[in-house]
């Protein structure tokens, strides 16, 4: 097969704006106008329209007289297949023998001292939202480099040895969930449930796949903590 054919058949990855629109439509209980969507995710209205048209072509959104209504199951499937978190550099790996919630609280305190936004994802955040097992690792998204040693963590060689994975992102949309999902659970900031779900698959393992199934059900039946 030629390189051009491979390129045409490859799955095109979403940019940050498209991923943010998808998360917003999954979270929303009702239709949203194009203007409201553009404003909420921080893109231009023409760009929002372009994204919505693409989603409509893939049966992931329906246009109604009141706005656009997301087909949430289809949006989740597309999110898993097409999104990738945009990182400034490679993720870094850290380890501590402290309980995972204690590690997260220490890292959050460090982030607060450095005025650095932070939000937690799998394993810890899904366990706080829809308990499933004893979490062994968590991903922390930050928007600047943090000296994790100051939170009592030591460098680990890789994912298999880590209790905490730090991802430095320049995508502010990854650092807070779409409304009306709650942005904080048990005193810890969490990423959007869609990203938590994606990260469970990214971390891998049969038990995480089961946890992802439970989280998906909780997303779809709206049983996760909400601000309203």
Residue ranges and their predicted role:
Residues 30-40:
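Short acidic, hydrophobic short linear motifs in intrinsically disordered regions
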Residues 16-30:
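Short amphipathic alpha-helical interface segments
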Residues 147-228:
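Hydrophobic alpha-helical interaction segments
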